[in-house]
Amino acid sequence: MNTYAQESKLRLKTKIGADGRCVIEDNFFTPPFKLMAPFYPKDDLAEIMLLAVSPGLMKGDAQDVQLNIGPNCKLRITSQSFEKIHNTEDGFASRDMHIVVGENAFLDFAPFPLIPFENAHFKGNTTISLRSSSQLLYSEIIVAGRVACNELFQFNRLHTKISILQDEKPIYYDNTILDPKTTDMMNMCMFDGYTHYLNLVLVNCPIELSGVRGLIEESEGVDGAVSEIASSHLCVKALAKGSEPLLHLREKIARLITQTITPKI
């Protein structure tokens, strides 16, 4: 059973306000979710932080998140801290997320890393619907466990799915299954001695494959690559032995893109 009285839900809908910047049109949330009001660190690029007033996900926790980014909005969504998945005993925790990005809208979805504790079991399913003119940066960073405590790959199972559609046609699907019981997570085809994994997707972003490759190559402590997916969109996969190198790489890519789409930055 969920710790809270009802399923944990979050709804966010944005639009362009009277001053031409992205604002919240409607929102709704149940515990432990909260939303910070948008702030504007760079011109018309809004930033909204998603808050979860809890120590992390437990057995039976189920999150239902729906984000609707209105036409012409430029928005960055972040989280407050690293997300912890605690021991889920004989159950699991889950998140179902649906994101819609409207015409000529830009979304940078940049949560902090996910840390599965010993015996944690997590299921995540994300569906993103775009228009042909939508722009997207979407990432997840998965940690091997409580690395500082030498707790590596002691979780039960972690399964995340990402499905991206453009004008209702699928352009990207990622199915990540990490099951230490059946797979040697440290072999060269998996983490190969690394402890942190970045998965980043860029759709319709003004950056070339060669530019992303250059940022990866100049990132100390990062072993990664970029590949082209459907319609010349890009996907970055990278490994490191800490969260900071991956967060810095992601930030460099995002900064280069936002400088182009928001010229006054």
UniProtKB/Swiss-Prot annotation:
Q: Which GO terms describe its molecular function?
A: nickel cation binding
Single GO cellular component term: cytoplasm
* Pfam short name (any one): UreD
The record's subcellular locations are: Cytoplasm
S-S pairs: none
Entries under InterPro entries matching the protein: UreD
Keywords annotated in UniProt: Chaperone, Cytoplasm, Nickel insertion
Assembly and binders:
UreH, UreF and UreG form a complex that acts as a GTP-hydrolysis-dependent molecular chaperone, activating the urease apoprotein by helping to assemble the nickel containing metallocenter of UreC. The UreE protein probably delivers the nickel.
Q: Which family does it belong to?
A: Belongs to the UreD family.
Q: What does this protein do?
A: Required for maturation of urease via the functional incorporation of the urease nickel metallocenter.
PANTHER family reported in the protein's UniProt record: UREASE ACCESSORY PROTEIN D
Protein name in the entry: Urease accessory protein UreH
In the UniProt record, what gene is named as encoding this protein?
Answer: ureH
